Design a protein with these regions (language model features):
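Inter-domain helical "communication" segments and dimerization helices
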Residues: 1-97
Length: 97
């Protein structure tokens, strides 16, 4: 499934909301995690950087971050993107659960 199967305006609205969020909290993390499949990998990379930058202000446990990275990895495997697979495996290995 790709983002072409979804209403483009709704996808854009979610993307804009996440890009405009200065401080990410649990809601933004949940929204991102649950809507990963509607974004391309370039957008996911940028949004994951926002997650990483907000980790010190978010009240989440590492299991939530682990699930996000595991889901991103699944998408990277589907796209056969070896560079991103390596990148996110390194991130996954750094997480302490």
């Amino acid at each position: 499934m790709n983002n072409e199967s979804f209403n483009k305006e709704e996808v854009q609205e979610i993307k804009e909301y996440l890009f405009k969020a200065d401080i990410w909290m649990y809601y933004e993390l949940s929204l991102f995690t649950n809507s990963l499949f509607i974004f391309d990998l370039d957008v996911i990379d940028i949004l994951f950087k926002k997650v990483s930058n907000s980790l010190n202000t978010m009240v989440v446990n590492n299991t939530d971050i682990f699930m996000l990275v595991a889901n991103i990895l699944s998408l990277c495997f589907q796209k056969n993107d070896l560079n991103r697979i390596r990148k996110y495996i390194k991130i996954l290995n750094k997480l302490s659960i």
